[in-house]
Amino acid sequence: MVHPVQVGKRTRMSFSRLKEVGQMPNLIEVQLDSYDWFLKEGLQEVFDDINPIQDYTGNLNLEFVGYKLDLDSIKYSVEECKERDSTYAAPLKVKVRLLNKETGEIKEQEVFMGDFPLMTEQGTFIINGAERVIVSQLVRSPGVYYDMTVDKTGSKLFSATVIPNRGAWLEYETDSNNIIYVRIDKTRKLPITILARALGYGTDAEIIEFFGEDERLKATIEKDNTKTREEALLEIYKRLRPGEPPTVDSAESLIESLFFDAKRYDLSRVGRYKFNKKLAIHLRITNQIADQDIVNPQTGEILVQKGEKIDKDKAIEIQNCGINEVYIKIDDKSFKVIGNHFVDIHSLVPFDISDLNIKEYVFYPVLKEILDNYADEESIKEEIRKNIYRLIPKHIIREDIYATINYELGLSYDIGYKDDIDHLGNRRLRSVGELLQNQFRIGLSRMERVVKERMTIQDQEVITPQALINIRPVAASIKEFFGSSQLSQFMDQTNPLSELTHKRRLSALGPGGLSRERAGFEVRDVHHSHYGRMCPIETPEGPNIGLINSLATFAKVNEYGFIETPYRRIDPKNKRATNDIVYMTADEEDLYVIARSDEPIDENGYFIDDKVTVRAKEEVLVVPVSEVEYMDISPRQLVSVATAMIPFLENDDASRALMGSNMQRQAVPLLKPQAPIVGTGIEYKAATDSGVLPKAKNAGTVVYVSADEIRVRRDSDGGIDKYKLLKFKRSNQGTCINQRPIVSKGEVVAKETLLADGPSTDLGEIALGKNILMGFITWEGYNYEDAMLISEQLVKEDVFTSIHIEEYEAEARDTKLGPEEITRDIPNVGEEALKDIDERGIIRIGAEVRSGDILVGKVTPKGETELTAEERLLRAIFGEKAREVRDTSLRVPHGEAGIIVDVKIFTRENGDELPPGVNKLVRCYIAQKRKISVGDKMAGRHGNKGVISRVLPEEDMPFLPDGRPLQICLNPLGVPSRMNIGQVLEVHLGLAASKLGWHIATPVFDGAIESDIVDCLRKAGYSEDGKTVLYDGRTGEPFDNRVTVGYMYILKLAHLVDDKIHARSTGPYSLVTQQPLGGKAQFGGQRFGEMEVWALEAYGAAHTLQEILTVKSDDVVGRVKTYEAIVKGENIPEPGVPESFKVLIKELQALCLDVKVLNDDNQEIKLKESVDEDADELEVNIEGTENQPEEKEEKEKEDSDEYDDLREEDVEPDLEELSLDDLDLDDFGDEH
């Protein structure tokens, strides 16, 4: 039944039937926790890996002892960094110790290692003044993966890949002759026995003795032409280092360094964990028949007798007592199973070692050696600490390789299983911390080389750590990562939801990931292991579909980087749903049977039905209650935040829900935000976690509230907390950030209470659009193809008005001819144009500007021309004439207008940091109020998008029986074929709720059903079908049929017509082809392509066609002459030769063809290089204005149209797209 729920300061009527168990985690903890780990542990790991750096003689030893981020000496606050274009960072100080072994002298110093970018509380970084987000990357986890293919004859061929975190890959494959090959580090394949020999099993007999009798092994030995360990080593060396003289010693050291050297080969913690999980012997012997007695080597006790079945517990016991080889019986054959000899340390050490913090399995032979040699608790613990890298090796060991070969052999007997690489148990997340750690490691290893070189060069007596260390490579690699990595993205700040989603994004692209072109369908597909971890709905349309995903609402990332999702434990004894919550990774989840969250249970947690619908791996089954082990915790745990904000998601087709999720992120913040009448209840959580709203840091009482500051007196010590509110700031996307207080003086606030609303929030709930009275009705064809008809009331009352702020900057530089100057004194500019310019030459705040108006007056010195003798004489007599300058003022670009809201001035004198060569920098901010207009794109939350086709006067809109006119008319044909019925249910419920004065929460998969909506309509006094008679506003006659009318939540999207509309008469031309550029940013023309030419040909419009292909495009002389004719009012002259024809001839000549152009009399026509001498004579500048009205390519353009589009690898600039105006010619003086 519908019940009230308190959400922040608002009460919503909720239709949910389920009691939520467990809290949703903080939605940006992916970012915060990861960076936190990096500062606490990640940095230390890198230093540990590189310690100590020794010189080549082994005499000098440099060690990093400890480090600290100096948080007290941060230069600027976050806000100041944004204003000054600087990076929010803290200095990293590292304590370094230098030991000279000959003299025994130790020098310690604290060395500054560069400024380290800090994460803000919102999970972002400020890099050069721009707010950026580091997107988490989904990559294949290191480990060993087995695969199976079936060949032409129908036999199964198995292959395997051993993937480290870094280092050489090992790949096994079987051919149709049953020979097993290995590739080492992607080289040519060798029989696998060569590898086994090289690792220590030299003769055929030893190999068969160790691995057991096997047909494939024998076939491989036959193929193998080496017979001893030495031969095998030389063979491998020849393959890996062709052309070098092979010796046994060099071959041995090569294999050692390839696989068994922690600096060259790193499995990482995850890799070791996955290896031990896959190769553990207990998994492969469970439920098998023993072929020999299995005896505990310590006690001599028989664990399993020959012919007995091994159960799961016995198998684990066998592994943990150090047994690594077990014979089992398969189809009357004996097969030897070999593990990698890792055991659970807790089952072997007789006392508690939880303080050692060892969670992984450890290598048994090393542990046994420690336990055999030491008896007391303290020394055993001490030895374990000392030998931790031998117990848990970071690199692969011989036993691992033997176990992988044995697993490969066992697969043909159905022992073990093949892996699915798209399973989330085999893909992990690399978040900020790890990505940064890898980058830092690269920087440090570059630095290590420098340090070693300096150690050998410098005098060992006077050497200091400071003199050895060069921090440049470290600083450069960090800077490179934040500035240009594909995963470091300009934050999508259109609204709070787009910020939040950007921080929770998971990308499979980027360095070390996939590339768009290579990614097939399997990787992009929805997988059963995504349930509760990755949203199946929210992903971009286009080339990135399925490669960029979003984290599900309840998901967390564990220490290994695997995504976990929570489940309720079902008590195994009485099968009652408990409130214990267990987080599980995808491969753990596969072992259990899991019921859905909306399975009916009574108030004590017992299942009401005898049979229950469950998920088991990829299957959905119906099983008796006794088999259920876990239960989902919430119906919305499988979707992302944006998707969970679509009401009635369960009634929408998936592809439309996808558009709905994506379009909510493009909603522009409106002047007066309004929370949805029909919400889903997650709006408050999303807004509070997005980081755009100020929260109380401590509990207390509000003592002062104004538009831009709130003060709270703390309860704890009576001190005052001040909160500055952001007023009309520009976001990354040019939308407006403005915060408004929602607390009043005297109000008592708890810790974490919201104090103010931000952009697109209303009482702390995300409010992306407006509740609009609409009807599904066609009107005179203005609804055709999803177009929308809107009422003029929406324009008059500023319902969909938004504020947009653009930033423009002018810098005064030093040029060869002298410094540029910012001044009010500009040549050839009348007083009228300077009316809003102050005495400094800068526009005043509050001035209204249109395109072409001066924002900052600036003059640049012109080159002196050669003077004649007479002029020199006059100059000498009358003194220096004023030097020539030209006007290079910053003007409002074409098509822009608005009001100046802020001006910032940075100069060298004030001590501001400016780029070299810049003396003064002025930034102007122009705000525009954009009302809704024809051509703007609007959308609902169900993927129902459209463009406004007409703004109709209020009195002409269809109206209700009570006289209220509709605000929007939508096409009823937009619903049935698209199958997003959620919008219809939303409209009905919205109608009833607005009459009842309710705000509604209808959570996804647990919301209102049809009968609930009918009840609400009845309660509100409307007809049960939600339809009503509508009257035509023009005639007052009723329409023929009753129409569905109600309230729909509608968003205005960031595709505004003002940003797209564009017109050009003349402007810049491309350098080579001399054709006009394309696109609004280049102030380009409209493309007249091949098909358009056909159209004119078909009409026989010969003159129009000739004109378009010549004077309107690339006939350089013709276009000047035409312009002249128009100016002088004469007839248009005949066109000349288009430049592209000359380019074609040049291209043919470049192919060594002698091409001549002949006339009718076979006379050669000389094509002269067309120069604009005619233009100079005319003094007509048709190359656009001298300061080309090119919009300042803003910082955000670097992240192409869709912010999900991770930037392509560096794109070569297309020469044709560069126009002369694009080159910065100021640096070349005035020769041009």
UniProtKB/Swiss-Prot annotation:
UniProt keyword terms in alphabetical order: DNA-directed RNA polymerase, Nucleotidyltransferase, Transcription, Transferase
Segments of skewed composition (Acidic residues): 1171-1180, 1199-1232
Species of origin: Clostridium botulinum (strain Kyoto / Type A2)
Role description: DNA-dependent RNA polymerase catalyzes the transcription of DNA into RNA using the four ribonucleoside triphosphates as substrates.
Name assigned to this protein: DNA-directed RNA polymerase subunit beta
InterPro entries: DNA-dir_RNA_pol_bsu_ext_1_sf, DNA-dir_RNA_pol_bsu_external_1, DNA-dir_RNA_pol_su2, DNA-dir_RNAP_su2_dom, DNA-dir_RNAP_su2_hyb_sf, RNA_pol_bsu_bac, RNA_pol_bsu_CS, RNA_pol_bsu_protrusion
Single GO cellular component term: DNA-directed RNA polymerase complex
Catalytic activity annotation: RNA(n) + a ribonucleoside 5'-triphosphate = RNA(n+1) + diphosphate
The UniProt record lists the keyword Transcription regulation: no
Subunit details: The RNAP catalytic core consists of 2 alpha, 1 beta, 1 beta' and 1 omega subunit. When a sigma factor is associated with the core the holoenzyme is formed, which can initiate transcription.
EC number, UniProt record: 2.7.7.6
GO biological process: DNA-templated transcription
Region (Disordered): 1170-1232
Skewed-composition ranges (Basic and acidic residues): 1189-1198
Gene Ontology molecular-function annotations: DNA binding; DNA-directed RNA polymerase activity; ribonucleoside binding
Family assignment from sequence similarity: Belongs to the RNA polymerase beta chain family.
